């Protein structure tokens, strides 16, 4: 257990940084080394804030997307299997800890309809999200352009706002797992924009123009 230090165990960090993290170099831009190191940093911040085991939170974050070596739709399940089957982790963790860690990795997907089974699942699910308003706006526009090429600018705006209301508004389906997190503050910023479509349209128009420039 490692709840007293503000950092995970040095030998565990050395193992993860040399044996685990390099695997992310093979994944797409949204799940690359920059992504996993961001999830690790956020996980450690949340774990320290709530007094969770830093070694567990660190390792869960490091393994959470390894399943992207296979089909994306089940990558969270595959990632959990990779973690539980890695016998090298027994050097640092008990079988019970590893079971909790496997379940946390399985529960990390933000689209999961049920709550993560433990605080560790909640930590990695929250750390894996990016609710920075400008990032959400840009990604939603990018998704619309890629998947609905037949829509004109007005059509994209309508689809964009439908998605914003459905997922991120006060009545949306997004659920935050840890109160007082950075994500809670960012979600409130986004909700203020959703509640004022004229302000949101200014952001939409700017990013839409950037994403369609040169077409």
Predicted regions and their residues:
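Short alpha-helical hairpin
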Residues: 3-22
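Short amphipathic alpha-helical interaction patches enriched in hydrophobic/aromatic residues
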Residues: 24, 47, 65-70, 87, ...
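Short, well-structured alpha-helical segments
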Residues: 33, 37-40, 58, 95-106
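Hydrophobic, well-structured mid-protein blocks that either form specific transmembrane helices
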Residues: 81-117
